[in-house]
Amino acid sequence: MGYAEKRGGYWRGRYKIEDGKYGTVADSAGVVVKFATKREAKQAADAEEVTVRRGQWRDPGLGQETFGEYASRWYAAQDLAASTMQNYRRHIEEHLLPDFDDKALAGILRTDVDAWEKKERASYAASSVKTWRSTLHLIFEDAIEEGLLTSNPAARRRGRGKRAGRSRDRGPEKVVTDALGILLTAERASLLSGRDDEFVATVLKGYTGKRWGEIVGLETEFVRPNAFRVEWQLYELDTGELVRCPPKDDSYRDIDSTDWLSALVFNHIARTKPTPCPCHGRTYVFRGQGAARTGGHQGARLVDVARRAGVSTGTVSNVLNHPDRVREDTRVRVELAIAELGFVRGGTTSEHAAHWRRNGFATWLFTPAVSGWYPKKAPQEARPVPILGEPWPGIPARGRGAAARAEACWLPIAKGLTPHGLRHTHRTMMEDLGTEKVLMDERMGHIDGSVSARYAHVTPGMRRRLMAGLTEQWEAALALRRALHPRSPVAALDRLLRTGG
């Protein structure tokens, strides 16, 4: 049985945990409870011994570790895909630590979590906040498993809260296009890049539904006569590193290909003659767009010269391009800074960047292609793509004064469409063709765990019907494009228009 112990002006309760080990009655924060009477202390000690005998006792000192300390330990113990680790790190550092870092685990209440969620929802999409709360819930669940907590303050209680307005938690409907939209977008992306690679990649994405990382990470050895094998992807981390890793959810698969699509990709490989990339030593179907800069951020930048010379970046630019516009003493100061910092104008370049960057591709190629506008990117505001009207559908004007030389601009094809939206588009096109769900899931790399899916299987007939349907959609899109103009400045498309696809 427990007993009371006199300590100066108060009593404390003592109880037996195991042979030779006694505990002191404490509150939920691990602070010793000071009782006014011997009887109260004895009763509390007896109650603690009952929980010990029932196997329900936990050390009140546990859970006093701060959330920040525990989250660091928790993250270090995870052994997951690089993409998952990156997401967890971002969730913890950017959204959880600012509110919970210094709080003891046991001191975080459900009301604290609800208040945090309400604050986050005021600034971020509901779907994002839901993901961050799921990460918080997972961390607390592991703390419970370690015996640090008895309940999860991030757990949601069923049937609580407002029902009205829950539909607003849905994300905005994904913009999709059709076969002609894919073709026109691919043509414009190619015109913006100045080469055929983006035309082939955009058509491939639209007619296979491959994920972005699966397109960038497509190796030549996995291009087969009638299929594209998904064995790897290249996942871009926040650091800029591209990691070669298995496809999402281990969705290894063969995606059936139409004859015309296989020919388009094989001709692209024959034309570009890809070589192994320096970063992975693998031969990829597609190269990055533009030059790979080895100067730039790795060496002195324009802004570094400006800071060194105590002038604006515009003044440095004038010294480099129009030295006659700059005062002599300023020019000398800038040239001295250039020499001191070893600034190299433009850096040294190789032929091409090894791989596309998700943000660069979407910002400067895909978004302008589908909307006809370059997006807002500080310090520049959103602006129409300046177009020289001939040959149709127009060539993007480049260099200084491009806007003044422009003769036309592009109308939107599908404003709001994203590269991932082509994956939604492919699924929509298959739905339109009446494709069986089991085949659609196979192509998309989705797993259907339902009982009905267990008894559904893909047949050769299903595959043939889908290939015929996709070919019909492609040929119809080519015919519509040919009706707009019989030729194209994009060489790959021009050949298809002249030969009938």
Specify the residue positions occupied by each region the protein language model found:
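N-terminal core-binding DNA-recognition domain of tyrosine site-specific recombinases/integrases
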Residues: 3, 34-38, 73-153, 193-194, ...
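N-terminal DNA-binding module of tyrosine recombinases/phage integrases
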Residues: 7-12, 17-111, 115, 271-285, ...
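Conserved tyrosine-mediated DNA breakage-rejoining catalytic core shared by Y-recombinases
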Residues: 12-14, 156-163, 184-185, 217-271, ...
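Basic, Lys/Arg- and aromatic-enriched nucleic-acid-binding interface segment
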Residues: 130-134, 149-218, 251-252, 277-283, ...
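Short, basic (Lys/Arg/His-rich) helix/loop patches that form interaction surfaces
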Residues: 187-198, 208, 272-284, 288-298, ...
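Short, polar N-cap/turn motifs at the start of nucleic acid-interacting alpha helices
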Residues: 221-227, 415-416, 435-454, 479, ...
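C-terminal secondary-structure termini that scaffold catalytic or DNA-interacting sites
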Residues: 237-261, 274, 307, 339, ...
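N-terminal helix-turn-helix DNA-binding module of bacterial transcription factors
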Residues: 297-349
